[in-house]
Amino acid sequence: MLKPLGDRVIIEVTEAAEETVGGIVLASNAKDKPVTGKVVAAGTGYVLNDGTVRDLTVKVGDEVLFDKYAGQEVSFEGQDYLALHEKDIVAVVE
C-alpha cells in the first residue's frame, strides 16, 4: 500500500457518472473531472516551525470533496489514485 508523507493523503477517486439523472448518456469529454473520493491513506501530519507535528484533520475512510485540479494522479498495483495535500480538501462528507 502507498504510505503518504507529511500532510499528503491518497484518495480513491469516485468515477464521474456515465449518464445524467434524466438518462442522457454523456460523451467522455463532457464529464466533469471527479471531485469526490475516499481517503485510503494519510500522512503523519504537518511539521510546525517549532518541530512539533500537527495531526491531519481527515482520516482513512473519510469521503471527501477536493479542488477540481488538485493533486497528482498515481497508479499503484493496477489501481488509480490521487495524491494531494490536505489543504486541497474542501470538505468531509458526513
Swiss-Prot record:
GO biological process annotation, one example: chaperone cofactor-dependent protein refolding
Transmembrane regions: none
Main location: cytoplasm
Entry GO terms, CC: cytoplasm
Gene Ontology molecular functions: ATP binding; metal ion binding; protein folding chaperone; protein-folding chaperone binding; unfolded protein binding
Lineage top rank: taxon: Bacteria
Keyword hit for Chaperone: yes
UniProtKB keywords: Chaperone, Cytoplasm
InterPro entries reported for this sequence: Chaperonin_GroES (IPR020818), Chaperonin_GroES_sf (IPR037124), Chaprnonin_Cpn10_CS (IPR018369), GroES-like_sf (IPR011032)
Location within or outside the cell: Cytoplasm
Similarity comment: Belongs to the GroES chaperonin family.
Oligomeric form and interacting partners: Heptamer of 7 subunits arranged in a ring. Interacts with the chaperonin GroEL.
Role according to the record: Together with the chaperonin GroEL, plays an essential role in assisting protein folding. The GroEL-GroES system forms a nano-cage that allows encapsulation of the non-native substrate proteins and provides a physical environment optimized to promote and accelerate protein folding. GroES binds to the apical surface of the GroEL ring, thereby capping the opening of the GroEL channel.
Record-linked PANTHER family: 10 KDA HEAT SHOCK PROTEIN (PTHR10772), CO-CHAPERONIN GROES (PTHR10772:SF58)
Protein name, as recorded: Co-chaperonin GroES
Organism listed in the record: Leuconostoc mesenteroides subsp. mesenteroides (strain ATCC 8293 / DSM 20343 / BCRC 11652 / CCM 1803 / JCM 6124 / NCDO 523 / NBRC 100496 / NCIMB 8023 / NCTC 12954 / NRRL B-1118 / 37Y)
